Amino acid sequence: RSYKRNNHKMDADGTEHQKSEGYTTLKEAEKRKKEIEYKQSLGTFVVPKCTKVKELIKEYVRIYGHNEWGVATYDGNIGLINNYIIPTIGEVQLSEINNHFMEKYYSDLLKMPAVKSSRNPDADKLITAATVHQIHKVLRSCFRQAVKWDMMDRNPATDATLPKYKAEEREIWTAEMLMQAIDACENKWLKVAFHLAFAATVRIGELLGLTWDCVDISEEAISENRAYVFINKQVERVSKEAVEELDSKEVILIFPSQRKNNKTVRVLKTPKTDTSERKVYIPGFVAQCLIDIKKEQDEVKEALGSEYTDYNLIMATTFGMPINGSYIRDQMQKVINKEGLPDVVFHSLRHTSVTYKLKLSGGDI
């Protein structure tokens, strides 16, 4: 059995508003009645402007998301909202949502098919516990804002029990495996990517965003063992919608699309946090790899003239555009298949790097 209470409030113009709230027990309904009566006696009770989840989500994105999210976070959260939140609970009244509702919702999600994507091309997989945790993170933040805006009295996601999940442990290469891959590598871009991932512990987006003004590979620097790369930006593919909606300060430039109908663009952007900016010293042989790249690039620029679009990128195509991360990953997969190495992702090379440095330093890095 459920219990309902109708709340009445007069606007400044004399218009009366009625809002219905549902409760699972009479005790909850009576408690809420006392809270409302107390707030009304103080003149602080305000009928929320948003009554449904979809209305709240819209306000949340417009006010909070546009101010707090970067373009990549916007893409991820909007995907969760459009795929899993609005279609399932968008029409639900805010007054009906409590801890019990949230726990049942999370449980029900695990029985629903996941939306078709690059990771689920055949749309034959169910929503995972990991995705439910991501959805919970968005809703918890959304409901926190609703409480702050006096649209809800409490956050129903705060104490909700989530489905258990264990993060998948991915295999990583040993330093010896990475050296084997480098020795077998015939692609110059993959080779320099391997070297920088290991020596400078860079992510693939940071690698693609490296520019010549952020390295010191001079003869003097190399001879004194102080050649370095300074990591302060990255290349990332994001939706055009995110760029247009956010007008984000983190975006330094937008690379031109090679296809007119693309829904995504590549951008050069600042890192996620200030702590991601770092100066990393590199060995002389890695500096020499960059010198060779620079020499070849300068020759291409001279030959092409105005046809070369100079973004000052280290990892640049023949015409100056940033190299695609997918190209690096494809080349890496060829080496993996050829050498029979464990099937790892490029990001795992950072863990290989950190593990090796910890071993060398005895845990002091």
Regions found by a protein language model. Name each.
Residues 21, 25, 61-149, 167, ...:
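N-terminal core-binding DNA-recognition domain of tyrosine site-specific recombinases/integrases
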Residues 85, 102, 139-142, 150, ...:
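Conserved hydrophobic/aromatic pocket- or pore-lining residues that grip, position, or stack substrates
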Residues 169, 184, 268-277, 316-324, ...:
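Short, contiguous acidic/charged loop-to-helix segments that flank catalytic cores in large enzymes
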Residues 115-119, 123-129, 133-135, 148, ...:
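Basic, Lys/Arg- and aromatic-enriched nucleic-acid-binding interface segment
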